[in-house]
Design a protein with these regions (language model features):
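Structural signal for hydrophobic packing residues in well-ordered secondary-structure cores
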Residues: 135, 166, 170-173, 177, ...
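C-terminal extensions of enzymes
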Residues: 1-15, 23-32, 39-40, 143-149, ...
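Glycine- and acidic
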Residues: 148-151, 156, 216-222, 331-334
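Alpha-helical packing segments of well-folded alpha/beta enzyme cores
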Residues: 127, 158, 162-165, 169, ...
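Glycine-rich phosphate/ribose-binding loops and adjacent secondary-structure elements
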Residues: 160-163, 172, 176, 188-305
């Protein structure tokens, strides 16, 4: 259930309530693909750095340790000892991005595992069943993820099939939630808008899926080849047709600047591997811009990663020390940097929410949208 508390322009300040708590929005979901954050962060760490929602991956957990094992362990919350909300993606993106050997049919997709090459089938019903076994609070519809740009005729064909798959997802989600032994009978299904960079196809698809009256809607298929401006144009085209009383989720996006600009265009939920992935390569975010900690100029730098940051890392360690850890290939380097970057993203969302509460979001946007994209 989503409650809109305040708005400034199209930017929205709200609350989303599910079986495992209430989420303050706009929010960034911390990505734990296989039930853990890459970089050795635990569920306890996530609490300490302000994470509200954890995101895990259906495809990867289906392969290892298998969703049936997770179900036997009591569901993903119990398995990873995380008591907050969890969103699971449908596995569609990974099926289409990781497997070069795949065959798309009306019933679903036949593909080869990227781990051992074994043949696997996944369709709308299978995706819903896997996510039901995981017991997430939010499950995402199974969809086809296409590259940008793609031929218009193929995009239209793909979107029509994705719509039919969503109808099947909705029916299967309702069936599974009604079972007496289901892990999370309050699991919510969110639909995904597709259509590549064709605004008219996007708008038509959004209108059709809005009629299905789902608890939330995502804009998918972006940040996969188009420019930032093309992405913003798509959001602006689709947003007027997204139900105002439902959550809006921009999948796989993005940089701090992308997030600020998408909030300004009416988006509530975000996820991206960027903060953790960049951290693992010593590329860090700060309130003055992006830092590459491997640069020689930090070798004798006694200051924290970001003097304006109060994360556990910045309160204790110097740039020089963390740089040394990277050069020495110590695992602690990744842990500290992932912790800092995720804290930064969670703090960014907190500051956006505070700005919306105080009616100062546009001023915040003017101050930080361009600044956070700089390299220093």
């Amino acid at each position: 259930m989503f409650t809109l508390k305040k708005a400034e322009g199209k930017a929205r300040r709200g609350e989303f309530t599910c079986a495992h708590g209430t989420v303050q929005t706009p929010v960034f979901m911390n990505v734990g693909t296989q039930g853990a954050i890459k970089g050795a962060l635990s569920a306890e760490d996530l609490k300490n750095i302000g994470c509200q929602v954890e995101l895990s991956n259906t495809y990867h957990l289906h392969l290892r340790p298998t969703d049936k094992v997770v179900r036997q362990m009591g569901g993903l919350h119990k398995f990873m000892t995380w008591d907050g909300p969890i969103l699971t993606d449908s596995g569609g993106f990974q099926v289409f991005s990781l497997s070069s050997l795949r065959k798309i049919k009306e019933e679903g997709v036949y593909f080869a595992s990227h781990i051992d090459g074994r043949k696997i089938f996944m369709g709308p019903e299978e995706s819903m069943q896997i996510q039901s076994n995981l017991g997430s609070d939010i499950c995402m519809a199974f969809d086809e993820c296409i590259e940008n740009p793609s031929p218009r005729d193929y995009v239209q064909k793909s979107v029509d099939r994705t719509y039919r798959w969503l109808v099947r997802c909705k029916a299967e989600n309702a069936r599974l939630n009604a079972l007496p032994d289901t892990v999370n009978p309050q699991q919510m299904l969110w639909g995904i808008n597709q259509g590549g960079t064709y605004a008219d196809i996007r708008v038509d698809h959004m209108k059709r899926i809005a009629d299905l009256d789902l608890p939330g809607y995502a804009i998918g298929g972006l940040a996969v080849g188009e420019t930032a401006e093309e992405m913003y144009d798509i959001i602006e085209a689709v947003e007027p047709h997204m139900p105002k009383e439902k959550t809006r989720y921009l999948m796989g996006v993005g940089t701090p600047t992308n997030i600020i600009e998408a909030v300004a265009r009416g988006v509530d939920f975000f996820d991206c591997v960027m903060p953790a992935r960049n951290a693992r390569h010593a590329r860090l975010f700060s309130w003055e811009g992006a830092i590459n900690l491997k640069n020689a100029k930090y070798q004798l730098d006694e200051g924290p990663i970001d003097p304006k940051c109060d994360c556990p890392v910045c309160r204790r360690y110097s740039r020089a020390y963390i740089r040394h850890l990277f050069i020495a290939e110590e695992m602690l380097a990744m842990r500290l940097c992932v912790m800092h970057n995720l804290y930064f993203y969670n703090k960014l969302m907190e500051r956006i929410r505070n700005a919306l509460d105080e009616g100062g979001f546009e001023a915040f946007r003017r101050e930080y949208s361009e600044k956070l994209a700089k390299r220093i």
